[in-house]
Design a protein with these regions (language model features):
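Active-site beta->alpha loop and helix N-cap motifs at the rims of alpha/beta catalytic domains
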Residues: 1-82, 88, 92-94, 98-99
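Surface-exposed amphipathic alpha-helices with a cationic face
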Residues: 13-22, 47, 85-95, 145-160, ...
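Hydrophobic faces of well-ordered beta-strands that scaffold small-molecule active sites
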Residues: 26-30, 54-56, 99-101, 121-123, ...
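Glycine- and other small-residue-rich loops at beta-strand/loop junctions that grip anionic moieties
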Residues: 31, 77-80, 101-102, 140, ...
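Catalytic cores of alpha/beta
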Residues: 36-45, 106-116, 169-186
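Glycine-rich phosphate-binding active-site loops on the catalytic face of alpha/beta enzymes
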Residues: 49-64, 118-135, 183-207
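Histidine/lysine/aspartate-rich catalytic loop segments that bind and position anionic ligands
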Residues: 59-86, 107-138
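Alpha/beta catalytic cores of nucleotide-metabolism and tRNA/nucleoside-modifying enzymes
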Residues: 145-165, 171-218
Length: 218
């Protein structure tokens, strides 16, 4: 349990922004359901440090199984997707920020696109497969592309100008990402575990195995 927005703001200010070179695009992933923060002030703090883009994946209630008891408890306590939509609208309409919306279900995806009108929308097809800690019982890459394309079609109906990107499920490798580009009508992809977890696991495991295989000369 931690203050995710404070952690995001502090890390961005102290570690990311000082290390930036050139014209990198920095997006702050914020928790719009933070009961201890005025989101207008959080957004202003982002702008003040030079961050001009925000997303609602920090974390999102959309990720929680909507049929679960915990989802019902959270929403009844005021932790809602509507708060995330309101944050994205505030960032775009009143603060002039680039917004990246995200949804884990078709219903939530349509709601975010219709109400928040984000500049970019990322359809999250599910937890990324692969690696040491990946979830390996999810969709195939073909199913991931099919499900993602269906979400794209529905999102365009309510927000025709949105830029659409894919994420998650079976999109584990660059080859998988190429499959998504070739078999969906989106504009790109958003990586996570496929760039910052799985390749590192492989590299560290390979290096450790090589060291472990060393022997003293006779």
């Amino acid at each position: 349990i931690l203050d995710s927005n404070r952690q995001t703001l502090d890390y961005t200010r102290e570690d990311i922004m000082p290390a930036m070179q050139g014209k990198a695009f920095v997006c702050a992933c914020l928790n719009a359901n933070d009961p201890l923060k005025d989101m207008r002030m959080v957004l202003q703090e982002c702008k003040d440090m030079g961050v001009m883009s925000v997303s609602n994946i920090g974390p999102s209630i959309s990720y929680v199984d909507h049929d679960s008891e915990i989802y019902k408890v959270m929403t009844s306590a005021g932790i809602t997707l509507q708060n995330e939509i309101d944050m994205l609208r505030l960032a775009r309409e009143e603060m002039g920020m680039v917004t990246i919306g995200l949804g884990f279900t078709l219903e939530d995806s349509i709601a975010v696109c219709e109400q928040a009108k984000p500049h970019i929308f990322c359809y999250h097809a599910g937890t990324t497969k692969g690696g040491l800690k990946g979830y390996d019982k999810g969709l195939t890459i073909e199913q991931t592309a099919e499900q993602t394309e269906h979400a794209y079609d529905e999102c365009r109906k309510v927000h025709p100008d949105v830029i659409l990107v894919a994420h998650g499920a079976a999109m584990e490798t660059p080859k998988d990402a190429q499959f998504m580009l070739d078999n969906t009508s989106g504009h790109g992809f958003w990586t996570g575990s496929s760039t910052e977890r799985i390749p590192i696991e492989r590299a560290v495991t390979a290096a450790a195995s090589e060291f472990a295989g060393l022997r003293f000369s006779d």
